[in-house]
Amino acid sequence: MARLLWLLRGLTLGTAPRRAVRGQAGGGGPGTGPGLGEAGSLATCELPLAKSEWQKKLTPEQFYVTREKGTEPPFSGIYLNNKEAGMYHCVCCDSPLFSSEKKYCSGTGWPSFSEAHGTSGSDESHTGILRRLDTSLGSARTEVVCKQCEAHLGHVFPDGPGPNGQRFCINSVALKFKPRKH
């Protein structure tokens, strides 16, 4: 209760409340601590956007994929053949999701990664992603969403390269690439 009061004390009348999130885009990322970024500062994010606000912020294709759980056509994504070193962020909230070091060519038509950024062994608690059961096509698959804004990113399959055997099949349109600074 004390923490909630501390969070609310800076609000003035007419100010929309902000909610604490774990990590911050470009910092330690989601999962770095209980509402704290790397430097220990409280990271905040606006309340979840309404559908109309997402439609204003995103292109129609980005909205369809990230907010309506769509899929871009295979072999059409801008990042499919990207070989530049850097980080792939969520197009909706800028949370770091996947490193180019874990990207590989799976031949499936979508950018593929062997693990999410921040994975330690099989521990994904410090990554920017969440896994969810998806039964939308009549069979069970594992959906991958952004931990910070719940954007649909793609799916993960158990047919990837070793040692963990995972293939994160991610829509390019759900990503924003930031090249590594030299």
From Swiss-Prot:
Molecular function (Gene Ontology), one example: peptide-methionine (R)-S-oxide reductase activity
Keyword terms: Metal-binding, Mitochondrion, Oxidoreductase, Transit peptide, Zinc
Tissue: Ubiquitous. Detected in retina, ocular ciliary body, skeletal muscle, heart, colon, bone marrow, cerebellum, small intestine, fetal brain, fetal liver, kidney, spinal cord, lung, placenta and prostate.
Name used for this protein in its record: Methionine-R-sulfoxide reductase B2, mitochondrial
Gene: MSRB2
Subunit structure, as described in the record: Interacts with DAOA; the interaction is direct.
Segments passing through the bilayer: none
Binding positions (Zn(2+)): 90, 93, 146, 149
One GO location term (cellular component): cytoplasm
